[in-house]
Design a protein with these regions (language model features):
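N-terminal secretory/membrane targeting signals
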Residues: 1-25
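Hydrophobic alpha-helical segments and their helix-loop boundaries in membrane
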Residues: 24-246
Length: 246
C-alpha cells in the first residue's frame, strides 16, 4: 500500500470517529413512568404476558373447544382413517366451531370488560371480573351438578348460596369433566353405525373364506361412502353446535 493510500485511509477513519463522537455521547433514556407507578406497570406487564402465554389453555378450559375436538377425534377413529383429516384440519375446525358457539360470550366480554379497560374507564380487576361473567354463565349452563359437588367437596370450601358465586377454581375443572363426559357420549353414538359396518364386512369375509384379508381395509370405503351419503360433516357440526342450545 502506498503512503498516499495509507494517509487517505487514516483520514477516513479519523473523520468517522469525529462524526460518531457526538452521537455516541448522547444520553439514552427510557421513560418508565412517573414516581411509584413503575412497580404497578411492571406487574401489569408480567400479568399480561402470562395471560397471553396461557391463552391456548384458557381457550380449552372455559369454552366448548374440549367437547368439539374430542368428538372430532373420536369420529376420525370410528372412520378408521388414522391421519385423514390431519390434526391441523381437525383442530382448525374445532377452533372455528368454538368461535361460532362462543361468539356471544366473546362479544359480551369485550363490550363489558376489555373495551372500558382500554378506554381507561375501569381497573384491571374490574375488567377481569366483567369479562369473566359471560364465560362463567356459559360454564354454569353446561356443567353437571354432580361434578360441581365433587370439586366443592374436594376444595373443602363452604358452598355459596348463589351459583354465580362459585369460585372459578371449582367451576372450571367441573366444567371440563362434564364436557369430556358429553364428548364420550356423543362419540359412542358415532361409533355404532361404523361398528355395524365392520361386523357385516367381517362376517361376509369369513363366509367367503377370505380370512387373510383384513376387514378394516374392505370396510373403510363403505364407511366413507356411508358418511358422505348421510352428509356426515353437516350432521356432526350441526349436532355439536345445537348441543349447546345455540
Amino acid at each position: 500500500m502506498s503512503a498516499r493510500s495509507r494517509r487517505l485511509s487514516l483520514l477516513a477513519v479519523l473523520t468517522f470517529l469525529l462524526a460518531a463522537g457526538p452521537a455516541a455521547a448522547q444520553d439514552i433514556s427510557i421513560n418508565f413512568g412517573q414516581g411509584t407507578g413503575l412497580t404497578e406497570r411492571v406487574i401489569q406487564m408480567v400479568a399480561l404476558l402470562t395471560v397471553l402465554s396461557l391463552a391456548p389453555s384458557i381457550l380449552v378450559m372455559v369454552t366448548s373447544f374440549t367437547r368439539i375436538v374430542v368428538v372430532l377425534s373420536l369420529l376420525r377413529t370410528a372412520l378408521g382413517t388414522a391421519t385423514a383429516p390431519p390434526n391441523a384440519v381437525m383442530v382448525s375446525l374445532a377452533l372455528f366451531l368454538t368461535l361460532f358457539v362462543m361468539g356471544p360470550a366473546f362479544q359480551t366480554a369485550y363490550d363489558t370488560g376489555l373495551r372500558p379497560f382500554s378506554a381507561g374507564e375501569i381497573t384491571a380487576e374490574q375488567a377481569f371480573e366483567r369479562a369473566s361473567q359471560p364465560f362463567r354463565a356459559f360454564m354454569l349452563k353446561n356443567v353437571r351438578e354432580k361434578d360441581l359437588v365433587l370439586f366443592s367437596d374436594l376444595s373443602r370450601e363452604p358452598r355459596p348460596e348463589r351459583p354465580q358465586d362459585i369460585s372459578l377454581r371449582i367451576l372450571t375443572p367441573a366444567f371440563m369433566i362434564s364436557e369430556l363426559r358429553r364428548a364420550f357420549e356423543i362419540g359412542f353414538l358415532l361409533f355404532l353405525p361404523f361398528l355395524v359396518i365392520d361386523l357385516v364386512v367381517a362376517s361376509v369375509l369369513m363366509s367367503m373364506g377370505m380370512m387373510m384379508l383384513p376387514p378394516v381395509v374392505v370396510s373403510l370405503p363403505f364407511k366413507l361412502i356411508f358418511f358422505v351419503l348421510v352428509d356426515g360433516w353437516t350432521l356432526v357440526a350441526g349436532s355439536l353446535v345445537q348441543s349447546y342450545g345455540s
